[in-house]
Amino acid sequence: MSKKTFEELFTELQHKAANGDPSTSRTAELVGKGVHAIGKKVVEEAAEVWMAAEYEGKDAAAEEISQLLYHVQVMMVARGISLDDVYAHL
């Protein structure tokens, strides 16, 4: 499995959202569906993080967290929110 930084993933998702084919790119598909659909995935993944952290092992929790981070970044791309916009609030 390839390892990416948070920043590398964000750059990749921006590219896929702008240039990807929704029939072959999950990112392009989600961005095309809009904020409501992405938001539903964020909520779903957040619940899965909680369940994995409480009832499963470290690896399962880490996998669910990675999926949550992906969907949060897709939301950022869809809304035109940059990493710097978020970092300004940390």
Swiss-Prot record:
Gene3D superfamilies: MazG-like (1.10.287.1080). It holds the Pfam family PRA-PH. Pathway: Amino-acid biosynthesis; L-histidine biosynthesis; L-histidine from 5-phospho-alpha-D-ribose 1-diphosphate: step 2/9. It comes from the Bacteria. It is an enzyme of class 3 (hydrolase). Keywords: Amino-acid biosynthesis, ATP-binding, Cytoplasm, Histidine biosynthesis, Hydrolase, Nucleotide-binding. It catalyses: 1-(5-phospho-beta-D-ribosyl)-ATP + H2O = 1-(5-phospho-beta-D-ribosyl)-5'-AMP + diphosphate + H(+). This is Phosphoribosyl-ATP pyrophosphatase. It comes from Streptomyces avermitilis (strain ATCC 31267 / DSM 46492 / JCM 5070 / NBRC 14893 / NCIMB 12804 / NRRL 8165 / MA-4680).
